[in-house]
Amino acid sequence: MTEPTTPLMQQYHAVKKQHPAALLLFRLGDFYELFYDDAVVASKILQITLTARNKEKGQAVPMCGVPYHAAENYIARLIRAGHKVAICEQMEVPGPGKKIVRREVIRVITPGTAGGAGLVDAKENNFLAAVARSAGAGVAAGASASGAGRGGARGIEAAIGLAFVDLSTGEFRATEFSGDKAEARLRDELGILRPREVLLARPATLFPVNVPAEMDGLGAVETRLDDWVFETNYAARILEEHFRVAALEGFGLVGHAQATAAAGALVHYLRETSAIGARSPEDSAVIPSLRPAGAGLEHLNRIAYYEQQEAMILDAVTVRNLELVEPSTGDDASATLLRAIDDTATGMGARLLRGWILRPEIALGEIEARLDAVAELRAQTVAREEIHRTLEVILDLERLTSRVTLGVATPRDLLALRGSLERIPALRQLLAGAMLSALSDPSASGVTARGNSRLSSLHEELDEMADVRDTIARGIADDPPAVAGDPGLIRRGYDAELDELHDITKKGRQIIAAMEERERKRTGIASLKIRYNQVFGFYIEIS
């Protein structure tokens, strides 16, 4: 890589040094540009032309670019190829006299932190996982241990902690394995989860022993962090800070040091990759298309500790041989159990069904409650079909609300959220009708107290969120722009001052002309004129 010779390339190199492992999308006007090796890699993946900068000076710099307004599609392709992407935005509006605008990385998107509509599969979770090992767990392979002074060194059984989060839905869970089968149980759980990215303490390996053939296709990107990130005391502190609690008893993490360490590493990493960028509201206003997500982890408001044995344990060999969610050979997904029974109407339902298949329920009461609820709806064909039709027009509320919280929602995402929430009252009414019909003729529907309780709880727990619907309806225009910073986002009448400012921008010439006429009359100077140039802005000229 040649030494940068221009202020722009010096700025690029300074930013790139901060994110050496990511493909850097560097905003230049209406394009995101990539340079040097990043450009070579991206051009092959995106199938775009690789050009060069400064060829005439004998210092050709490979480069390629993508339009900023279509960046999400290109970013999705880079993420699916297993790369991390750092987005470097212009933090100032280019203007006269500015030789170079300030630029900063506002967000780092990785395979495990992707949350955009085009970045993740609608019917699958996009998990980011972390694995923490105590002293003695996987030491033979050089695995780094978290929690100084803990583990086998003092006679405590070595343990492996696993935590995982789906940033696009808010699901956040953790577990822990111990004993001589801990490594095998970790492999089984990762085989079920299929995370896109796994965090490890440097210089640990994911599997400290030989990897079984059935795990070859895990395909997760391995990201190594400093080992202090997995230190248990630090992890507990960062989790307490994130959840705004004094202790972690309410989350079931007490006594599970490695699960705590893994969960803390996840929160640390999410802060590192998301809490980047605009330093002030003024900065945020400059870059509305890709606002930073650092203040947007509030939807991760709880973590659930679970034991693997709470559901039927399926190892990777069983999942593969039974073709539960993926075909054992080839790419024909129609051969799987999931495809055979999946008639879900929403992405949320599809992900739930997939999870149920991979973690079969073993609690008799829960199994019977599900079956009874199914029996009720099966006996009511009309109600069932109406519920299905209503669900079909409800978009992915989990991911829409997550995008809002992350600060990356577009104006049209907000309209989609409003439209989906407007269907909730009708859905609640349909559930209430189904409950009444089942109760009026229990012999026909096979209704039991358990089944009716399940439909009843669904009816009661559905929040119609009328205040959110009303806020969006009053505030967002019916046909908003694709980008938040473009004119026409806020509905006229929502804010009088904003309406006045819009009028000024639209009727600027008329306003200046009227002001000029008023000043002529007030001063009695007929030659008074209001002029503008790029050096002084608006000024009064008297000749």
Can you annotate each of these PLM segments?
Residues 1-376, 385, 392-405, 409-441, ...:
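Charged catalytic and DNA/RNA-contacting regions of genome-maintenance
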Residues 202, 532, 542-543:
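Active-site proximal loops enriched in glycine and acidic residues that flank catalytic Cys/His/Asp
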Residues 510-530:
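Flexible, glycine/threonine-enriched loop-and-boundary segments that flank and lead into catalytic domains
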